[in-house]
Amino acid sequence: MAVKKAALACSVCGSRNYSITANSNRTKRLELNKFCKHCGKKTLHKETR
C-alpha cells in the first residue's frame, strides 16, 4: 500500500492551495469544500495528481 502526494486545486481559479498524502488504491479523486485564499471564499477543491 503506497502513500502518494497529491494537491487540492480550486475548481474556480485553478490554484493549488493544499497538499495532501493520499492512498493510491483509491480510484475516485477527492473533492472537498475548502477555503481558497485567492478567491476569498469556500470553493470546491479537487485532487490533482
From Swiss-Prot:
Keywords attached to this Swiss-Prot or TrEMBL record, sorted alphabetically, are:
Ribonucleoprotein, Ribosomal protein
Q: Which GO terms describe its biological process?
A: translation
One Pfam family hit: Ribosomal_L33
Keyword Coiled coil tagged: no
Entry similarity comment: Belongs to the bacterial ribosomal protein bL33 family.
Name of the protein described by the UniProt record? Large ribosomal subunit protein bL33B
Q: Which organism is it from?
A: Lactobacillus delbrueckii subsp. bulgaricus (strain ATCC 11842 / DSM 20081 / BCRC 10696 / JCM 1002 / NBRC 13953 / NCIMB 11778 / NCTC 12712 / WDCM 00102 / Lb 14)
Return the NCBIfam families for the record: PRK00504.1, rpmG_bact
MF terms per GO, please?
structural constituent of ribosome
**GO-annotated cellular components:** cytoplasm; ribonucleoprotein complex; ribosome
* Gene this chain is encoded by: rpmG2
